[in-house]
């Protein structure tokens, strides 16, 4: 008998039962293709995929699952919870990894590194979807249409929470009901209903902060997961090894780098009970109350284990006991030590402390058994800044010209908080521009959705925002550097080239220095006569390199209090390291670093020199920090500063020769209307011995001479016209001065040459050239 082979594909028990009912199962040989399922290890989602119900796997895995880009898959956690996603290819992960965001991870109760099962699934088109916000909102039909557009083709299931991007933030909507009631996806014919009454916040198990909300900090995230997440999720591993998990972690670093965010994300990812303690809130003037509060916090944590106690600004409640005069602080520290030693069920309660002053914390807390690990949270590098900008712009409508790579390069020294503020400020600029362009009336109750869709943030908005957001690390020492380019400095080509090599090259071509095996120069000393452009060169270096710029005026460092001057130097270098790449510019360095042993003061300058030597060539390396110093008295500088390893480059800034004087005059007269009889070459030849500052003064004086001539003419005309009427005279002379065009003539320059004299004599020039030769011999 001939047996027909019927090829049937099915994904549920329904097909099986139908075959039995038709009594075909016994008569027909069935080849059933069950939906293929594969196990994957969970990794973080890309920023662009957060909240979009996208799962990314390798192309090889997609072929194994028999899915194409955009198909729907079911992701099943270890305890059977499942979620839907659209599958997309990833080219930067292995075949056993899957990228899913915090919303999907939370709904199926898995964390980074856990295993999930993935299979292709059938999803029905939705006829109706009912949503509810998690907080009270006002909305109109245009918002409903916007939500529908956002959710188009996205797979949905009852009970899940969806983040809807709203300008710089998100609004969470919960899926209350769907028709049909199984897995569905939104189509053009789907009826979207949004209820006004919000669902209860407590009923939601979705994260407010996930790992994807933290740009950068990959190393810190990995360390903190090893210390906290592994013991809480898999205590049996530590029991097998016969070791106790850590009790505490101290996160330290500058303000705004993400310490608090890191702790919150950790608690959300592992589903731990989270208690936030702000250090100063613990303190009380009543005897024993501060200690009682701490005991209650630890008791609450143990009752709700697994839990995390996060103590922000821990230095406020646990300072060094020998440094404080109050008894309250000492008792609080003692209580904290006792409670951390007495934590039961290690690995179930973790204490995380955060501070930007780790040295101020009592040493007894900083030993194994209390704060077992200390993790430094550093300001982000260029790649980290780009990651952070991606986090803060992922829900922002931006134009195609927004270049996050360029913005990351321009924001040296910016912390995560600074970059968040930058994104918000750019959005405000865009809003202001949009309102002006569209002439919107903000008093009207609603703005049409089609107009709102045109609102986008441009690169120009970010550049404008950069002007008002300063890096917080340098706020105390930040200097707004005037925009000075190399072209604004006439002559000095050799000096400019040396500065480019020492400062710009290491920042622009770091790989070149890595390959060569040499370290860039640490320090550059510019010396020469006054007025030759030393400070101007430092400004140009800061502008052209794009590095952060700290200007230190020598005399400002000096203090009558013992140790204050050295502390000021230490703080400057500490901030420079944190905000690297940084240029520290010491103007008039001879005032704070003279030859030791010769000064008659109380020894403050000697201590400053010692501190400078230690900072420039000490144990702590100067990574991407360049020191530029300027002086016109190199003969009185301490010799120890002038050796290689401190000031590696000693650059003589000479007075300009004739060619350089011509270039300087061209720079200073580029916006000055010159008469045809003016020859800058002739003026440059006559200005022998003039420095750059002298030539600037010469041009200024010549211009004022021309203005004097205009004033004399206008004064005569006004007096003749107004005949003693003072009100008429003031009005007439103002109009005359503002309307009359003028040009600076050769005669004006001749008069100026008689007024502005050269500040350098031949003897001065010879003396500085002698200094230059002596210094070169000294360092040779």
Curated annotation (Swiss-Prot):
The similarity annotation says: Belongs to the AAA ATPase family. CDC48 subfamily.
Whose protein is this, by species?
A: Sulfolobus acidocaldarius (strain ATCC 33909 / DSM 639 / JCM 8929 / NBRC 15157 / NCIMB 11770)
Binding, ATP: 253-260, 528-535
InterPro entries under this entry?
Answer: AAA+_ATPase, AAA_ATPase_CDC48, AAA_ATPase_domain, AAA_lid_3, Asp_de-COase-like_dom_sf, ATPase_AAA_core, ATPase_AAA_CS, Cdc48_dom2
What role is this protein assigned?
A: Not yet known, shows ATPase activity.
What GO molecular function annotations does the UniProt record carry, in alphabetical order? ATP binding; ATP hydrolysis activity
Q: What is this protein called?
A: Protein SAV
What keywords appear on the UniProt entry?
A: ATP-binding, Nucleotide-binding, Repeat
> What CDD domains does UniProt report for this protein, alphabetically?
RecA-like_CDC48_r1-like (cd19519), RecA-like_VCP_r2 (cd19529)
